[in-house]
Design a protein with these regions (language model features):
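Helix-loop-helix junctions within the multi-pass membrane cores of secondary transporters/permeases
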Residues: 107-178
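Helix-coil boundary and interhelical linker segments in multi-pass alpha-helical membrane proteins
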Residues: 5-13, 47-58, 94-117, 178
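Hydrophobic residues within the alpha-helical transmembrane core of Major Facilitator Superfamily
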Residues: 17, 53, 88, 123-126
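Small-residue-rich segments of transmembrane alpha-helices in multi-pass membrane proteins
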Residues: 41-51, 87-97, 163-166
């Protein structure tokens, strides 16, 4: 009998950090963070490395990438958050495949993976807008600093405070869900 995959706290924390890095433009930039690390194909590889099953991670990532390959975010609107798909959906799908004894390369395995991806993508959208809403507080603080000509405060407001938003709406949910 095969061992069922379990996700440890350390693995969940690493997945949460990857989720944060892939959603913060200030970290890797949009090109590396959101448009590379946050995509399911790359996220599948990263999840596979963290969870110790690279083959399943890549296959699950491929199945989810097919669903979201043409996803665009015009004007900042988000219909599905691929960061959540990559770092919540893929690990959960990998654990589910393991517990059901399904191969990720099978049709049933791919169907299970994509169902997890679409479910979590919708949840991720809510979390994305939660982050954006909290960031409005920092924006208001930034405008006040500009009005008072306290330009040095802008570094903290622009680069430091958004981490709080991402910890609340990205890191913590990713760790808890995994």
């Amino acid at each position: 009998r095969e061992c069922v995959m379990q996700i440890s706290w350390l693995q969940a924390i690493l997945l949460g950090l990857c989720a944060c890095l892939s959603s913060m433009p200030g970290m890797g930039g949009s090109s590396i963070g959101n448009y590379t690390l946050g995509r399911p194909l790359v996220g599948g590889l990263v999840c596979g490395l963290i969870l110790g099953d690279i083959r399943t991670g890549i296959l699950v990532g491929c199945a989810m990438q097919v669903v979201y390959i043409a996803l665009v975010t015009p004007g900042g609107t988000v219909s599905a958050d691929v960061r959540a798909v990559s770092y919540i959906g893929i690990p959960l799908a990998m654990a589910a495949l393991s517990s059901y004894g399904l191969d990720a390369a099978s049709a049933d395995g791919a169907a299970l993976a994509t169902s997890f991806g679409t479910m979590v993508g919708t949840l991720g959208t809510v979390l994305f807008y939660g982050t954006a809403t909290i960031n409005l507080v920092w924006q208001h603080m930034g405008w006040k600093a500009v009005e008072k000509r306290q330009y040095r405060k802008l570094y903290l407001i622009d680069m430091g405070f958004p981490w709080i938003s991402h910890l609340i709406c990205c890191f913590i949910p990713s760790v808890i869900k995994c």
